[in-house]
Amino acid sequence: MDFYSLFLIAIALSLDAFGVALCIGLNNNVDLKYKSSCAIYFGFFQFLFAIIGGYAGFLFNKYIATMPQIVGGVVICIVGIIMIKEGIENEDSCKILKPGMNIILGISVSIDAMVVGFTALNKIQSGLLILRDTLFIGIVTLFVSILAFITSKYLKKIDVIGKYADYIGGIILIFFGLKMIFF
């Protein structure tokens, strides 16, 4: 696969992570350590799922093609609902910061990478080329997630966004999850 095609695939796959990272970054309770772990998990699971898909390829393509969007969409909708609930309750404890939630989010934004592995990367003849391409996808996702956290830092300074960040982030995640499920 040529670099341009691989780069476009990597950017497309990382947009889920960008949206989720942006919403997480808008939350005032999120610290740098958590943001870093989210970005690392997002990148790692993009790589992992893409490489699994690339190696499993044609064997499961027929049966799993629609499930990733549904599962990922449901998880992201649930996170959106949790964010809105926290905004309404105005709690200091934040459920999206609970241990393991960053792993769940990392998996949910990366399931589609497995489908890409099934369809686009399974034709690559060499295991090293699959490893190279999937590492590239993971690294692009890592940097796109970091970009989202940097962007959210500046968006929080806008009073309306900072005040209603949980609602805005929750609504965006719900719409994003519904889009993943139905479109």
UniProtKB/Swiss-Prot annotation:
Pfam families: Mntp. The keyword ATP-binding does not apply. It is a multi-pass membrane protein. The chain crosses the membrane at residues 6-26, 40-60, 64-84, 101-121, 135-155, 158-178. Its main location: membrane. Keywords: Cell membrane, Ion transport, Manganese, Membrane, Transmembrane, Transmembrane helix, Transport. GO terms for cellular component: plasma membrane. It comes from the Bacteria. Disulfide bonds: none annotated. It is found in: Cell membrane. GO terms for molecular function: manganese ion transmembrane transporter activity. The keyword Transferase does not apply. Probably functions as a manganese efflux pump. Belongs to the MntP (TC 9.B.29) family. This is Putative manganese efflux pump MntP.
